[in-house]
Amino acid sequence: MLFRSIREIASEKAAIIVRGNRAVTGATDRGDALNVIKRAAASVGAPLTIATHGAVRSRGRDGIEVDLPRLGAVRVGLIGRHQAQNAAVALATLDAMREAGIVDVSDDRIVAGFAAARWPGRLELIDHAFGSDDRRDLLLDGAHNEDGAAALAAAVDDLAPHLRDADGECRMGGESRSNRATLIVAAMSDKAIDRIFGELATSPVLRAARLICTTVGEERSSTPEALADAARRAGLGAAVEIAADPQRALDGAARDRGPVIVAGSLYLVGAVRERLMRQGRLPDDGSLDPEATTGSAESRA
């Protein structure tokens, strides 16, 4: 199993910086990432913009509101406080492109674009019908590394007061069947599962959740039993169960009445999204391709 340091990841990403281009980064001093990127840009004479991180003003079901340079308070239609950093990098990139004459886009259009932003399978909140009289929140997230798991844990805690159960109520907390969340997880065996589950277990909501471990049938997929053992070691989930496949996991989740969270693998999230599209419960925007999204998935924040 291969674990790369932040410095190694930064070095790989900095390789795209070439002479004659501008570079924009949201990297910080964590793991020396910023210094690595600075040196790479300087070595080819590429002007480097370091994005100023925006401060989160509010968080809710429909995204976040963040203070961005020059624009002030802007609504971003993506859930998760980590999206403030991504928004700041996006704005800095657009500004650099405008200065270079590559794009001509007004601030009004930029603000509208942030509000309209959507990311299928990444902290995607769906009002889902589990039955004729059972509509509740279904949260899909492809978190499959430590940073992604940390972002999911923080987002779930932020969302907890707003997540709706099968009775249409927002009453997360405690461990009763009416208000605890159900977390469905699958993961590839070559991932740092203990570390990922350790990050998820930092969330009080996820520690108190009913956990259903499943598999997506890929050759690399970890067994539900191995996931259950890792969850117990991490203290993830107040009750831990096993399901042979995602459909049985969803059927099991329907037996409780709390919100449902699906996470740990883009393959799992993609399978659930495809099922919802076939049922007409999601727009048919194409299935989530784990292989096509691997690059962006590895650098979550």
What are these regions (language model features)?
Residues 248-277:
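A glycine-rich beta-strand to alpha-helix segment
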Residues 216-218, 283-301:
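Short, flexible loop segments at boundaries between secondary-structure elements
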Residues 280:
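Surface-exposed, charge/polar-rich loops and edge strands
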